[in-house]
């Protein structure tokens, strides 16, 4: 939850939006890292 809160700042998310999106797609494909990665880059959606 702490990470999610930190991600809530828009300016920060906008900067890493591309990087997050790319990594997220790659990670989400694998079941092992899916949870961790998706949670980490969740900021892209909100």
Curated annotation (Swiss-Prot):
GO terms for biological process: cell differentiation; chromosome condensation; spermatogenesis. It comes from the Eukaryota. One of its GO terms (molecular function) is DNA binding. GO terms for cellular component: nucleosome; nucleus. The keyword DNA-binding applies. Its main location: nucleus. Belongs to the protamine P1 family. This is Sperm protamine P1. It comes from Hypsugo savii (Savi's pipistrelle).
């Amino acid at each position: 939850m702490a990470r999610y809160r930190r991600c809530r700042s828009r300016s920060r998310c906008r900067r890493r939006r591309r990087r997050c999106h790319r990594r997220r797609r790659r990670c989400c494909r694998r079941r092992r890292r899916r949870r961790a990665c998706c949670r980490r880059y969740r900021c892209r959606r909100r």
